[in-house]
Amino acid sequence: MDSKEIILNVEKLNTTFVSDKKKIRIVKDVSFQLKRGKTLAVVGESGCGKSVTMNSIMRFTGKNAIVEAKSIQYNAMKDGKIEEHHLESIKEPNGAEMRALRGADLSMVFQDPMSSLNPVYKVGDQVAEGLLQHNKGMTKQEAREKVLEMFRKLGIPDPEERIDCYPHQFSGGMKQRVVIAMAIACN
């Protein structure tokens, strides 16, 4: 298969959590591919490791986790060319290389939108923060316009008013749309 078709290729992902007395493997030999233009649904029983799998790829597992994989390859498309990133070889989960990918290339929409939204900041500012972080030449006004565009695309009513609201002023579904805007704004 042409590597241009595959965005994410995960091979034999294992995640083990270490406590004082034992090691518990939560994710065992997970493999999958995500193809460009396609949707991948990860389903399973509660507690089966879906969230741990995705958190492992994004490197959100914490210090007591051991994440190992044969390969976690992310293929970014930059200026019509494939740019390969081997996430399994990134040693610092919060280092510059992983931070540069998060938000700009890789994003995750959590089940509970309030876990991603800060209650003391306006939702528009929270979406704009990622844009400004990953687009150094962008002005605050340009970021605001991009946020308004995202809100319109995602069906948030009255975006010109809602951009200056706080998370508690949104329904659960609208909060989810704000988090989706955060995830895709840099694409």
Spans of model-derived segments:
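ABC transporter nucleotide-binding domains
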Residues: M1-N187
